[in-house]
Amino acid sequence: MAVRQGSVGLRERESESTRRTILEATEAILAARGEEALSIREVCARAGVTAPTIYHHFGDKAALIDRVVDACFVEFDRTLRARPAPGDPVEALRSGFDRYIDYGLAHPTHYRLMFSRRRAHPTPAALASYDGLRRRVAAIAAVGRLRVPVEEAAAAFWCAVHGVTSLTIAGWQPGAPAARLVRDAMITQLTRPAPFPRRSRTASPRGSEGSA
């Protein structure tokens, strides 16, 4: 029984290693020449596997590309969550804007793969990534500081940060000052300032006696 379990475990590890090799080969080709140039034949040659092996693990070319892109989204989301967000929800959104751009500039190949492909239906990994932004915006709404509906604010903020990131990666280089200006303008437009703390109106007994 132990021998059988060991054999199953070995096969699972080998299968996972094969999938990882195929995904790495696919990512390298996509990064170098894009989706249109990708062929199963070249993936096979680079990964050292046969076409039936790829179809067994991933189904078809479209599903294979989806898996590569999803892995990029998972890494992206993990990176954005790696550092604790500030306690103030507006500052958390501001910090998220900066971290988003930092990731895109540090991983331009992954970023292009994530957003260069047209999708009829976003995958769970892509939706989970966007949901992180939506939750930050919802936290602002929860304390009464959002000027517009959550969905509209999240979409507008994402358009802004994606635009800055994409332009910078493409070589237009709007620069950090312009990025901060866009970030702060969006926050000013979408959110309300924090209310000032109320001062207590209760006079101290000693103060009352002194004024009598």
List the predicted regions and their residue ranges.
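Hydrophobic/aromatic-rich alpha-helical bundle segments in the mid-to-C-terminal region
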Residues: 112-116, 122-130, 140-187, 197-206, ...
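Helix-turn-helix
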Residues: 21, 25, 29-63, 67
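Short alpha-helical functional segments enriched in proximate histidine and acidic residues
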Residues: 29, 79, 103, 136
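Hydrophobic alpha-helical connector segments
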Residues: 67, 81-110, 121, 130, ...
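Pre-recognition alpha-helix immediately N-terminal to the DNA-recognition helix
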Residues: 21-29, 75, 95, 99
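N-terminal intrinsically disordered/low-complexity leader segments
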Residues: 1-17, 28, 196-212
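Short, basic, alpha-helical segments at the C-terminal edge of helix-turn-helix-like DNA-binding modules
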Residues: 70-77
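Short coil/turn segments at alpha/beta junctions that flank glycine-rich nucleotide-binding fingerprints
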Residues: 32-36, 107, 143
